[in-house]
């Protein structure tokens, strides 16, 4: 492969990433001479674009079609990073190594096999390790469900270690001396992963999912490096958080027709603070910084921050906000630089107020009010049919509440986090039925079951709803006693008699 100068771009964090990327691509700002005539339906056909997720791939396809003057085109190949097409190996001699990979083990099979190894673990502890517990018995795992719970965590740890290309052998030396004895308990437990589990995988001719994904990505790296494709190859939106992905991005940046578009590289952080991000992996203020991953990626590619071209299409106010966020998130060791902002005209109170005039703070009394406030803001934002709105939150409970509040307004929100099977209506009905049977007398579960929208009881919905409200008011509010499904009619009659005999003032 001919070594070329890496081509890297960045789209500011205050700009919608995919629309800005699509616009730059169609305008020919990423790959010289590509796509040529953007109105040609075949102009994009021979390009390959890697994006972080399947959702991003679907969104980019829609955006490219919308931006095409003819509203139709043969789209480029758009792949999620880490989701390498194994079937393509059948038609490409350069990826013959893919045939030698063992297929990944299924999630359920892995959990059950790990649980079977964990279940007898406490019986295999050496005497000197058991002595650490004193008179207490080693009670973990106590049940099969405990073993499955531990298996789930152990599987997650395996995926994390293999994703980061870490070595299990390094675990033995990381504990301080005063914890070394207790650390042996942990190491003994991890023998399940380091000694027993590889034997099971070898016996079954299977591999761990993370290791299998890494091997596929490394195969793609070798293919691109040894046999560069004829068309453009672009990686968009990746931070290279996975070592294998970082290497793939690095190779793409050096392809003759390759380019990498980064999301929100900080161009305002001073050199001292920027270099601090790569000085140590042990400082929480550095590896927890939002730019830490991008700093490592640029190091892996072998370029400086100044070599990255910024695709800028921002208003003055958004540019000021970008600087404010950069200053607010600078590493703690460099916050003394804030004193220098006093002479910066863009950082004066009036300028900051003007740039933040569209930012609102809403304080609510509880989670329901919070979700309702967000839903109202989203509803107001999309009242203009030419606008879109999004809620970005790591709080899944808040997201579900907002989706529910929007449904009251007849708005079907697209929740990218999806829904657990246990949370769909049919599953909640089944869960409530089981709970009322195995936990008789719980009025909350019983009322939730009676009020469930999928519970019909052979009548009309409005009639069932009125009956449920009557049951709640007469039988459960202000009274005592516990009722199960079996004795609910007798319990209701008794509560009616008690209510009739009370003297009302």
Question: Language-model features: where?
Answer:
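Polyanion-engaging groove/track-forming segments
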Residues: 1-505
């Amino acid at each position: 492969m001919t070594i070329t100068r890496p081509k890297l771009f960045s789209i500011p964090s205050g700009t919608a990433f995919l629309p800005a990327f699509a616009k730059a691509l169609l305008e020919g700002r990423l790959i010289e001479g590509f796509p040529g005539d953007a109105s040609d339906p075949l102009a994009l056909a021979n390009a390959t674009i890697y994006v972080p997720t399947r959702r991003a791939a679907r969104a980019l396809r829609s955006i490219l079609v919308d931006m095409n003057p003819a509203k139709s085109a043969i789209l480029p190949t758009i792949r999620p990073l880490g989701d390498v097409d194994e079937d393509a190996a059948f038609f490409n001699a350069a990826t013959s190594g893919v045939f030698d990979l063992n297929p990944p083990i299924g999630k359920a099979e892995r959990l059950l096999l790990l649980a079977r190894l964990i279940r007898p673990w406490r019986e295999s502890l050496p005497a000197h390790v058991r002595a650490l517990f004193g008179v207490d018995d080693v009670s973990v795992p106590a049940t099969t469900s405990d073993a499955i719970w531990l298996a789930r965590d152990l599987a997650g740890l395996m995926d994390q270690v293999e994703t980061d290309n870490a070595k299990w052998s390094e675990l033995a030396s990381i504990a301080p001396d005063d914890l070394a004895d207790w650390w042996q308990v942990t190491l003994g437990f991890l023998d399940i992963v380091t000694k027993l589990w590889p034997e099971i995988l070898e016996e079954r001719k299977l591999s761990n999912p993370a290791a299998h994904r890494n091997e596929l990505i490394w195969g793609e790296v070798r293919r691109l490096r040894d046999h560069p494709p004829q068309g453009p190859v672009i990686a968009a939106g990746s931070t290279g958080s996975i070592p294998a992905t970082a290497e793939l991005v690095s190779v793409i940046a050096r392809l003759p027709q390759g380019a990498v578009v980064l999301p929100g590289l900080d161009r305002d952080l001073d050199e001292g603070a920027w270099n601090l991000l790569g000085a140590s992996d042990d400082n929480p203020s550095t590896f927890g910084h939002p730019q830490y991953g991008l700093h490592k990626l640029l190091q892996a590619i072998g370029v400086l921050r100044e070599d990255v071209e910024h695709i800028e299409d921002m208003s003055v106010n958004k540019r000021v906000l970008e600087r404010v966020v950069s200053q607010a998130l600078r590493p703690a060791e460099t916050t003394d630089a804030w004193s220098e902002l006093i002479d910066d005209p863009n950082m004066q109170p009036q300028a900051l107020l003007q740039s933040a005039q569209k930012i609102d703070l809403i304080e609510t009394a509880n989670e329901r009010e919070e979700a309702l406030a967000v839903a109202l803001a989203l509803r107001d934002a999309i009242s203009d049919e030419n606008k879109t709105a999004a809620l970005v939150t790591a709080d899944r409970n808040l997201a579900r509440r907002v989706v529910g509040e929007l449904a009251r307004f007849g708005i079907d929100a697209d929740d990218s986090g999806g829904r657990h099977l246990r949370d769909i209506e049919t599953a909640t009905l089944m869960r409530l039925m089981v709970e009322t049977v195995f936990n008789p007398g719980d009025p909350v579960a019983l009322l939730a079951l009676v009020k469930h929208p999928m519970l019909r009881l052979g009548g009309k919905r409005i009639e069932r709803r009125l009956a449920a409200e009557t049951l709640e008011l007469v039988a459960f509010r202000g009274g005592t006693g516990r009722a199960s499904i079996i004795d609910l009619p007798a319990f209701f009659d008794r509560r009616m008699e008690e209510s009739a005999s009370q003297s009302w003032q």
